[in-house]
C-alpha cells in the first residue's frame, strides 16, 4: 500500500475520533494493542464460520461432481422428503371431509390388523421356540442320563473268556462291557429266546434266572430268586388288564399267602440251622417234627425263665412262646399240639384256635373275632407275656398299632406279624385300630418308613424283600435298579414279572422309572419297563450288540407314543449305534443273494425292519449305509435314488486311490453289475439318471487321464450336449428331462467338452505346421468343424433354463474366442 493510502486512512481515523469526542453521552474506551488484537481475532472467526459452510459445500460439489453426482439436485430431493408415517394424513383432515375420514379409518384398521398379526406371529414364534427348547432339553437329559449310566463301575472293559459264548455264534471282537453276572444272565436270556423263536414250549424264565444265582454262590441273590419264584407262584388268570388282575382281592390274598409261606419257610430253615449248629444245647430228641424242633430251638433262644410268662409251661417251656414259634414256622398242627397239652390253662382259646386253623383263609367268623377282641381289650392288652399278646393279635387280627417289639425284633418277624393282620373283607364293625388293609401296610412301609428306616443303602436286599413281599413289585425293582452293582438282578426280576403279565407298566415311554398315574388305586405304582430295559442295554449295546438284541426281543409287543413297534425302533438304533450292519441284518453276497443276520431268527418279516433301519440311517445322513440296507431290503428305487445323490458331487473329481470318488465308483459299479445280471431295475427316471452318472464318471476319468479322444467318444455317445448347430434345439429340449443330479454337473461337463475341443484344435494347428504336405482342404474342414462344435456349446449354454456356476460362460467364450 502506498503513502497516499496511509494518509487517507489516518485522516479518516482522526475524523472518526473527532465525531466520537463530540458525543458526550458515550464513555471513552481505551484499548491497548493486545485487546485490539483479541477483538480482531473474534471478528475474524465469526466471518470464517459463516464462510466455512459455503466452502464445504463447494468442496463437496467438486468431489461428488467428479463422480457424476448432482449435489444440488440431491439436496433438493432430500429436503422434499417427509418424515410423516405411511398411514398419517399429509394434510389435516377437515371435519366435513367424509372421504378423507373414511380413508384414515381404513388405514388405521389396516395398521391395527397388521400390528395384531405381527404380535400374534411373535407370540407363536416364541411358543414354538419354547416347545422346541423343551424337546431338545429333554433329549439332552436323556443323553446325559444314558451317558452317566454307561460310565458306571460295571461299564469297565471286561475281557471275554476264550470259551465260546451261548449268546453268539462268533465271539464279539475286542472288549465287552458286560461283567460276569451280566454275561451269566444274558446266556439264560439267549436260552429262553431260542426256545420261543424255535416254537418250543416256553420255559420258566424265573427258573433260568435262579440258576444264575446258584452259580454265583451269593446267599442274598439265591434268597431273592427263591422269594421271586414263591411270590409269582400264584394262579394266573388270563386278563388283558394287568391292573385289574393285580388289584383283585383273590390275587392280593394269594400274594399275602405266598409271602407268609416264604417267611415261615425261611424261619423254619433258620431254626433248623440254629438247632443243628448247637446240638448239645438244643438237646434235640423225641418224635421228629416242628414241635420237637421248636422245643429244641427254645432251649437255645430262651435258656432262662421268661419274665411275665402266663398260663404255665409245656415240657419246661412257656406255653405261649411254644405256640408263637410253632405259628412262626407255619405249622398250625404243631401249635394245636401245644394247645391240647395246655388246654386247661387256656380257657376258650382252644375253641377259637380250632376255628382259625380250620378256616381256609385263616380268619375267624365275625362273632368269634369280636369275642376274642373283647377279651383281648379287657384282659390282655397290658399283659406281661409278650408272646400271649402276639398270638392273640395274630388270631384276632387286632391292635394293629402294637409292633410287638419284644417278640418281633427282626424285620422279617415284623413283616410276618403285619401280613397276618391284613384284612381283605369289608367289615364295617371293626374299629380302625383293629383293621389293616394291604394298601395301608404298603403305604406304611414305602412312604412312612421308607428307605432310611430300613437302612436300604446298606441292606438293599432287605428293603427289596420288604417291598416285594408286600406285592410292591414295581417299587422294589425301581429301588434295586438304582443300586449299580445290583442293576442286572432288578432287570431280570422285571423280565420274569413281565413274562408272567404281573408287571404294571407305565402307559407312556416318557414317564419316570417309577410313577403313579391318574385313575389308579392308591399305592399302585407303575414301572417304565421300556425305559428300564433301554437304560440297562445302553451300557453294552455298542460293544455287545447281539446280547442287546436278545433283550430288545422282549419289546416286540410294545408300542411307543407314536404307535411304532419298540422292537423295530430299538433294533434300528442298535444297528446305527454299533454299525454292525452285516452281523445284525445280514450281508449281500456277490450273486445278489442275502446272507441272513442275527435279526432273522427274531422277526418273520426282516424286510420291514431293514427298511426301518435304512430309513433311520438316511435321516441321519448315513447315505452309504442306507444304500446297502435298502439293497438288502430289495428296494431298488431308494438304492438308485441315494446313489445318485452320492455320485453327483464327485463325478467331476479326479480319481485317486482310496478317495471318496473311487469308493463310491466301485460301489456303484457293483450295484450296476448285480442289477444288470439279475434284471433288477428301479423307476425309469431314477434308473436312467444312475446309468448316465456312471457314464459321466467314465467320461471324466478319461478326460482327467488325458485320453482326449476316448473322452470325446463318450460324450458324443451320451448325447448330453450338442456337437453341432442342428442338435442344439434338441439338446435344450432334452435338458428339461434331466434330474438335478445331472444338471449340477453340467458346468463341468461343458468346460471339459470345450477343453477337449480346444485341445483338439491346438493339436490340429500343430499338425498343420509340422506336416506341410497334408491336404489343406482336410485341415480346413476339421478346423471349421471344431469351431462349429464350440459355437454349438456356447449357444446351448446360453439357451438352457439353468444358471450355471461361477464364470462358466466366460471361460467357455474365452476358449471359443481362442479357437477363432
From Swiss-Prot:
Q: Where, per UniProt, does this protein localize?
A: Nucleus membrane; Nucleus, Nuclear pore complex
Q: What happens when the gene is disrupted?
A: Mutants can be recognized on day 2 of embryogenesis by the presence of necrotic cells in the tectum and eyes. Dye mutants die on day 5 of development.
Is Membrane among this UniProt entry's keywords?
A: yes
Q: Where is it mostly found?
A: nucleus
The lineage's top-level taxon is Eukaryota
- Protein purpose: Plays a role in the nuclear pore complex (NPC) assembly and/or maintenance.
* Name of the featured protein: Nuclear pore complex protein Nup93
Q: Which species is listed as the source?
A: Danio rerio
This chain is encoded by the gene named dye
